[in-house]
Amino acid sequence: MAVFPWHSRNRNYKAELASCRLETVPLECGDYHPLKPITVTESKTKKVSRKGSTSSTSSSSSSSVVDPLSSVLDGTDPLSMFAATSDPAATVTVTESSRKKRDKDDNSFVGPDFEPWANKRGEILARYTTTEKLSINLFMGSEKGRAGAAASAMSEKVRTRLEELDDFEEGSQKELLNLTQQDYVNRIEELNQSLKDAWASDQKVKALKIVIQCSKLLSDTSVIQFYPSKFVLITDILDTFGKLVYERIYSMCVDSRGALPDHFSPENVNDTAKETCLNWFFKIASIRELIPRFYVEASILKCNKFLSKTGISECLPRLTCMIRGIGDPLVSVYARAYLCRVGMEVAPHLKESLTRNFFDFLLTFKQIHGDTVQNQLVAQGVELLSYLPLYSPAMGWIFQCVSYHAPEALLTEMMERCKKLGNNALLLNSVMSAFRAEFIATRSMDFIGMIKECDESGFPKHLLFRSLGVNLALADPPENDRLQILNEAWKVITKLKSPQDYINCAEVWVEYTCRHFTKREVNTVLADVIKHMTPDRAFEDSYPQLQSIIKKVIAHFHDFSVLFSVEKFLPFLDMFQKESVRVEVCKCIMEAFINALTLEDEKRMLAHLINGFIKMVSFGRDFEQQLSFYVESRSMFCNLEPVLVQLIHSVNRLAMETRKVMKGNHSRKTAAFVRACVAYCFITIPSLVGIFTRLNLYLHSGQVALANQCLSQADAFFKAAISLVPEVPKSISIDGKLRPSEPFLLEFLCNFFSTLLIVPDHPEHGVLFLVRELLNVIQDYTWEDSSDDKIRIYTSVLHLLSAMSQDTYLYHIDKVDSNDSLYGGDSRFLAENSKLCEAAMVQILEHLKTLAKDEALKRQSLLGLSFFNSILAHGDLRNNKLNQLSVNLWHLAQRHGCADTRTMVKTLDYIKKRSKQPDMNHLSELALRLPLQTRT
């Protein structure tokens, strides 16, 4: 490789600084000032055409200039509202319209306080399972729907639609029998995938047939225990279909005007999209059976937005009435649940249909206890206690939708209607699960009365009390009723024979007891739990509930001594006989009261407190006493690294305060004192563990020593830092994670170079001794192959050596003669400087050569341009070889099309601008030799 000599350009730092200063411009009193008060000008705009072209007129007491921003507004601009306070009528109008809009928006969206259906889906699938065999009808995929040419006449289209649907209903299906639950789920997933595949291949009729077939499955209650899970699986397919249809029609609305806005109106929808939408509704209307017609139309309910503003509000009541034709009460209630779910998604503000669904359900509620249902249960061998919980997911969802943000009067009416029905335990449980906790809590005694009147045979009372307890854990009942509520509930709970039923209820009511009563009542409850769970070691099957009880108790007892004074608390802990559970419970108690920290956290906390104390201690001008305090502190806290770091910083600050007091002119006494401070730091730093902490403290302490004219001590610090660089590991731990160390090493070395500029050479060592030692260490350090930090360091070395070759350095330390004063342009010094520069250049160019690979061309381009900029800033380009090297680097940066064109253009413009400065004519010739790469 050819050797390029380095020639530093001469710098006049004062002149460069003066040329970089901002130009001062006198500001007259009447001119604009950024802090001048803002004057609001009312702008009124008048809408001229539908396309949004406006003509605006502005009125102002101070100016008649038209506001350019007002031309794009359709109405009053927001800032003018505040300026229009002089017109009370306008203010009232704006306020009223804003209130109405806000109220409408509040009802148009479902907030985060509404639990979504997705949260209930997994729970339903896990709870409602079966071991019985299932059957399913699979669509075999007739091709008739896609055959033949498109009919032109309307009657032909209608006949074609009916034939396509009849083809499905007349035998294009296959019944699969004796399926396990998992097989059934897999078949449903296959149907879901078939729907997506058919849609993707533009077989829309086939997709509709699949959805119809799936909807028909919801009329089958042959395996009644599995029906809620079947409903979840089938409605997933319906949701997919509805989404596909909506997105298809929405995509058809994209034209030259762009896509539809989020809140579009039917006027924005083109005729093609409307016709397609109507076609879907006509096809669905052709379905003969009620249940599939209902479900498929409900799934695309949102598409009514494309046809009419009132389409959804008109369809919801009609679909609600359609459900009245479904005879099976279980199928009916889930149909209502699906309609409520779709309604809440597309039009949550339409509360009437939700309320109508609820009251229609109440009218048919007695069917649950009718002969038809009883005969069906007998035929399937299902007991009423197992049948009634099947209604819970659907009823809970309906109640949740109706009660969401419902007024108090409606909730009261709903409760009264439920109260009038017989055998209403199921209804009561749904009310307590869905209504607001505050509503339930304020009427706790009313609900207890209703629970007492319920028939035990239909729905267990302990489940009702559990639901009531859940609400009372979230909201407080009237204070006068609290004890009576606990007594009434516990009378029922304590009589439960099943340990599992008992603990499920007791777990909920323990929190109510802890919230509102003393340790006496809590002790009584714990004693009752021990009494019920100890026989036959029943507690072994209920560890999660028992752990929950412990957490609730300790959450309300903030005093450790009070908790352990509860007589039955320790016997309660004795029930945790499984070792892992016992450890977990004890850990929970310890964290609640002791807040035990890990060892490292504890050290960090102690160190933080000690450091705060050290910084507060001051002996005024008695600096020697201050240093003695720091020496004593070091001996006491030698195991706490953060404290040692703080002590080193404090001693360095003490040395600088001494310099400040002496104004840089040390006496014999103060000179000895600052040397003692420097020695303190030099002795303490090696005891630290963190390598970058040591490196930075060596550098910082060396700077302090240099500022106090302790030159030999400063050299010792810098030599120690240089000798420590080879020990830097490849990665370091930061916040428990391993990070590469090279970026931190690069940052440290760049700071070090800035200090080395002003460090004078030791008379007994060679020229630039510290720089040569540091370059040797950098050369021997093992760098990552994928990293360019080594070359960035060598580039920084070039910057340092260029600054060192100047007649006068950029900055100095007071009363310290740097090398510019010591050598005064000596040829031996400059020759050594040039030698080191050439060595650094060789390293840079060799690295650039190794990057001539496809995967490294981008890095080569960036580094080449960076080195070019370094030569431009620090090199003397009047030298022909250096000039040629810069041209080569320019071409290298652009060779493979990896360079950023904007950066190259700006760089070239900068060169041309600099060429106009005095003694910079040679840059004009350089600019002519630097072509810009064109991309075609």
From Swiss-Prot:
Family assignment from sequence similarity: Belongs to the VPS35L family.
Subcellular location field: Membrane; Endosome
Gene Ontology cellular-component annotations: endosome; membrane
Source species taxonomy: Eukaryota, Metazoa, Chordata, Craniata, Vertebrata
One BP term from GO: Golgi to plasma membrane transport
Keyword Transport assigned: yes
Keywords assigned by UniProt, alphabetized: Endosome, Membrane, Phosphoprotein, Protein transport, Transmembrane, Transmembrane helix, Transport
Stretches for region Disordered: 43-69, 87-113
Phosphoserine: residues bearing it: 265
Membrane topology designation: Single-pass membrane protein
InterPro entries found in the cross-reference section: VPS35L (IPR029705)
Chain ranges passing through the membrane: 672-692
Function: Acts as a component of the retriever complex. The retriever complex is a heterotrimeric complex related to retromer cargo-selective complex (CSC) and essential for retromer-independent retrieval and recycling of numerous cargos such as integrin alpha-5/beta-1 (ITGA5:ITGB1). The recruitment of the retriever complex to the endosomal membrane involves CCC and WASH complexes.
Protein name, per record: VPS35 endosomal protein-sorting factor-like
Bias (Low complexity) ranges: 51-69
Quaternary structure and interacting proteins, as annotated: Component of the heterotrimeric retriever complex formed by VPS26C, VPS29 and VPS35L. Interacts with VPS29. Interacts with COMMD1, CCDC93 and CCDC22; associates with the CCC (COMMD/CCDC22/CCDC93) complex which contains at least COMMD1 (and possibly other COMM domain-containing proteins), CCDC22 and CCDC93. Interacts with WASHC1, WASHC2A and WASHC2C. Interacts with SNX17 and SNX31.
